[in-house]
Amino acid sequence: MIYKNNTITFKEFCMKKHSTHILVIDLEATCDEGDGLPGEEMEVIEIGAVWATADGDVLEEFQALVRPTLHPISDFCQELTGIRQADVDTAPLFPEVAAQLASFAQHYPDATMWGSWGKFDDKQIQRDCQRHGVASPLPALSHVNLKRQFAKSRKIKEVGMARALQMVGLPLDGAHHRGLDDARNIAKLLPWCPPTMI
């Protein structure tokens, strides 16, 4: 794929960075309708991640539920994500899952980037790390807001992942608002993220 005003593909850009791999992460977090739950009190309840090639091919997958400590999962959140309180009652706490993610993030030592659809995931990881007093599980990787890059490449306002897939003619596979399924779908959009924007 060739982009206007650019002669290299996303894959070629990654190779210039001496890596053909990118870690794609999608989080689900506690939430409630309207202003029912302040942003600073939201907690990760699921982490989905995939290692993907610059072409969007998934190589490895990671998925874990996380037990929240501040608030139980609301009816609204359960309806949105399909994750029930019973699903997370026996799940590990964030520090344990963060350590698992840190290990998964080291599978491709040449990688330099991790991406998510928007900046929420990056901010929420930082928020939960601070809350639990643990280091970032992704210290060696720079965050890329793929939602912003997709929008800039098309000169449009930022759109949701489902809309982006529709715009490029790809199906939304799996369950929307589940970490691993969303991470897989975001990975499919990597070829439409122009390297000059990253």
Language model: regions and residue ranges:
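Metal-dependent phosphoesterase signature
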Residues: 80-100, 108
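Single-stranded RNA-binding regions, centering on S1/OB-family and related RNA-binding modules
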Residues: 7
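Active-site histidine-acidic residue metal-binding/catalytic motifs
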Residues: 24
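Short acidic, Gly/Ser-rich segments with clustered Asp/Glu that frequently serve as metal-coordination loops
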Residues: 27-37
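Metal-dependent phosphoesterase core characteristic of DEDDh/y 3'-5' exonuclease domains
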Residues: 3, 11, 16-21, 40-47, ...
